[in-house]
């Protein structure tokens, strides 16, 4: 995210309209694209005020719910798969509502039959060693930036260090997920993405 925001600043010198630079990402990149709109993070990474004009995120992992719910007012669109067992679409939908309720401009499009990677050309594939969240609950980010997660039995787990996250994975993660493209969804998602981006460029 830092590199992209710094790139936006450099574009000023290159006579490029930096007010029309958006960010797009897939999976983990989609997570980065989504949370790049979280203003406390953007303010830290780009203190001179560079911001993205749009945020297009394919099947992001919306695992974090910040206590400070200040978000960019730039348009945000999340493209989600209804059969994604890798990055749960339900978490993204809940966060989208939270962002919108907090004054942001976030929307989702759900492709009911879509797996993770629904726009890929690769066929449906099972990955037995992939790690995915097995929860409908968010990790929380407090005002200091510390991450925590409350389990169903009330245990509070930290999520700040590698060791913390390994312990967290042991509690709330599962092994084994499906990925795979769907040509019909691929075509629809491409059109939805182009329609979204074209509105920013007009």
Predicted regions and their residues:
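Alpha/beta-hydrolase fold nucleophile elbow
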Residues: 15-27
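Alpha-helix termini
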Residues: 13-14, 41-48, 102
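The feature captures the conserved acid-bearing segment of alpha/beta-hydrolase catalytic domains
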Residues: 47-113
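Sec-exported extracytoplasmic/periplasmic mature domains
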Residues: 37-41, 100-101, 198-202
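C-terminal catalytic histidine-bearing segment of alpha/beta-hydrolase fold enzymes
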Residues: 105-202
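Short glycine-enriched nucleophile-adjacent loop
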Residues: 30-45
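Single conserved hydrophobic/aromatic residue that forms the stacking wall/gate
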Residues: 1-7, 11-12
